[in-house]
């Protein structure tokens, strides 16, 4: 569980903030073979940047997070899911995923959002696995920052002289260092309000998609004062992928197939949000403004004589993207098989 600050969310595990220890190898959470690495995302056309998603694998290093009944550690599960989510996001043109931590080491909570900001993140996604005293507790959840947490964070930023030169407003890059205190307060409040609204929006889309592949603990986005969500300029969500304290869910969380399904559902929610709200100057904004984004999710039933490459060409979607969207490890498909066509596919066919 993540550390909370005055939250009514499930109790977190207090963590001492120490300098990061030396990096140690991650202990594998599954014996299944790792998916093949995909090539880096294709470069964007001039003036059409990629949307950047910062993925934060919860806990790490001396902070193991929650423990499963058979010894599974949250820090290993979250890193495995984060890496799979990064792989899937990077398979889609117009998006780039950056990991906040890439190995088994601890990063102080506030530094995680600092790292995301330095990477130019348009969205911050923190991955966790829940725990509860009752082993029967189950289901995935999504959190955004609470209103009370947002108010206290705005006050902290104004009081902290180190933030006076920081930038807010995402791609707008609005500096506070030349603003008087009242104007800085207004700008921060507007930025935090917009960020929170976007967080709730993308959070609900992620939650709805997760509900298709795993039980939900709550069917609405919950709000709490989690430290990693307190960025005034970056929409931020915290995803509880399931209860690692539940024997059944702990076993699923350790499998590659479930990690892939969770990552795919999170990616789908993120994609839906940015297709409706693409940051200006991005490739996705250009697709939308040019009318080249298909109106909604599509399915294709494989018929005799078709290959995956032909289907990808028909819908003008990358072969790697089509494989990722359908969790395919090869290009082998069967007649009658239903394929999901990513919503960013160009509508080449009626």
Regions found by a protein language model. Give the residues of each.
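Stable alpha-helical elements in mature extracytoplasmic
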Residues: 74-77, 81, 85, 112, ...
